[in-house]
Amino acid sequence: MGKIIGIDLGTTNSCVAIMDGGKARVIENSEGDRTTPSIVAYTKDGEVLVGASAKRQAVTNPKNTFYAVKRLIGRKFTDAEVQKDIAHVPYSILAHDNGDAWVATSDGKKMAPQEISAKVLEKMKKTAEDFLGEKVTEAVITVPAYFNDSQRQATKDAGRIAGLDVKRIINEPTAAALAYGLDKGDNKDRKIVVYDLGGGTFDVSVIEIANVDGEKQFEVLATNGDTFLGGEDFDNRVIEYLVEEFNKDQGIDLRKDPLALQRLKDAAERAKIELSSAQQTEVNLPYVTADASGPKHLNIKLTRAKLEALVDDLIKKSIEPCRVALNDAGLRSSDISEVILVGGQTRMPKVQQAVTEFFGKEPRKDVNPDEAVALGAAIQGGVLGGDVKDVLLLDVTPLSLGIETMGGVFTKIIEKNTTIPTKASQVFSTAEDNQSAVTVHVLQGEREQARFNKSLAKFDLSGIEPAPRGLPQVEVSFDIDANGILHVSAKDKKTNKEQKVEIKAGSGLSEEEIARMVADAEANREEDKKFQELVQARNQADALIHGTRSAITEHGSKVGGDVIGKVEAALADLETAMKGDDKAQIEAKSKALEEAGQSLFAAASADQGGAPGADAGNAGKAQDDVVDAEFTEVKDDKKS
């Protein structure tokens, strides 16, 4: 069995880790970075860019550059959070046929957020494969603890589209606790809080780490959060401030200009990061827009105090879930041994101050907020793969699960913060005389009224024997697996007729859609491989042409005119072939040129005493590595 890799699929950045020699380690991507921007871009020539290359070209291609799609995954288009996001992103968000929030490119190509996330997961998969030197097919992927069933299913689907068998979905704070807890050599029992404020989501979990019969047990006591609170919201506050200040000064609303908005987003994110270590920064965007009077420049000073005032309510919004989680765990702040900060936004001093004030203790600074979650996912992968022994993880379901009963009431069958995996059953009856079928409406949430909770699925149990209302007994059973994904069954206790359903929410992708997306991803991988091979053939041909022309100039007089004529003809043929996309043709014409110029290359080699670089006929082969590196650099420059 191959390695089970750990992936932190983040809103802003993603990270991949593996178990290596008994320790979890983060793997650097092809650019040498330990995290990868969760950004996917579609270029005019049909190329798909992922990560840093996608981020670099975002300013010039805002409508086809997709970021923060994790905030859309598993959500309906009509969700208030999605509607709020539409105003802040330059790309198009629209409703799919089933009501899900999808995205679209400027030429109308519609895609599910799962497809975009799959591209990021593919990049993580490739990063691990390059490091390990073997194929990777299995992964543990992290999600916010407060993700509901639809969002967890959607994340698993993204993994499938990327060609990964997702062995486990694990909550981000729990993963961070694993990374932190295993790093501690002692066997001391401790209760910790993981405060996870990432790019798009916020979670807080209260976790007990205990040594039970030589086994390190991580038990989640309570979790809470907000799946639409994160660094993106902090950035948006800065963007809104800059837009308003510029409008006051110049009378121009930059919200109507996608290019300007994308430049503002980059500048706002940079300014926010700078203000974690500086008291003041300057946002300077020359030629940000233009009107009839000419180009306009944006130059605005931003202080740390102003930034803190802009986001004060967002920071306060993160404290209430901390209070609820502590209360649900039956603990006080004084019972907590340590507070761990996870997520890039926790680097902000004001956030750290708020956490310190609430819990009455300084949060730990020895945990890398960008990498802890991926490391924990890799450890869980090691547990599942048998590489990590004596570790037991007991997670919880973040929200209550139940069904709608008479009068639109939400009846809970599994309470929030119940340790998973778990099963629970409850017996219900009919509401009408001689009722032959019941509809089971499965919901997730905390509100007493069913309509205010998240609808997960509806299914019918038919064939109930006619009887007065209240007599038939229908047993509804809920079964949550270790991924936090729900299976529901309803059984008529008299006839033993049963209806089972693995919750595939009314939102979400059908099996047919997933199969199509998997096939598309496979086709694209093959296409990318062919593209790289074509580029390599072109680069080798280009080096051969350059070497041949040099040989003609320096040594052409030593061979007959007929040889030069053949070489010139072969050169022209190769240059024509290079304008096309036929790799075989380019290789054939390259070979023809090498054969036509054999005597020329021999003369050049003899004249130079076989000096390095004189063998023009092997120019393409000898310099493969150099040419490839040059190609990569040129490509990036073109896209940025």
Curated annotation (Swiss-Prot):
Q: Which family does it belong to?
A: Belongs to the heat shock protein 70 family.
HAMAP family assigned to the protein according to its UniProt record, in alphabetical order: DnaK (MF_00332)
Q: Which PANTHER family match?
A: HEAT SHOCK PROTEIN 70KDA
This entry's comment on induction and repression of expression is:
By stress conditions e.g. heat shock.
The UniProt record lists the keyword ATP-binding = yes
Under what name is this protein listed? Chaperone protein DnaK
Question: Which intervals carry biased composition (Low complexity)?
Answer: 603-621
Origin, by domain of life?
Answer: Bacteria
Q: What does this protein do?
A: Acts as a chaperone.
Task: Show the InterPro entries listed in the entry.
Answer: ATPase_NBD (IPR043129), Chaperone_DnaK (IPR012725), Heat_shock_70_CS (IPR018181), HSP70_C_sf (IPR029048), HSP70_peptide-bd_sf (IPR029047), Hsp_70_fam (IPR013126)
Q: Which Pfam families match?
A: HSP70
Phosphothreonine, modified sites: T201
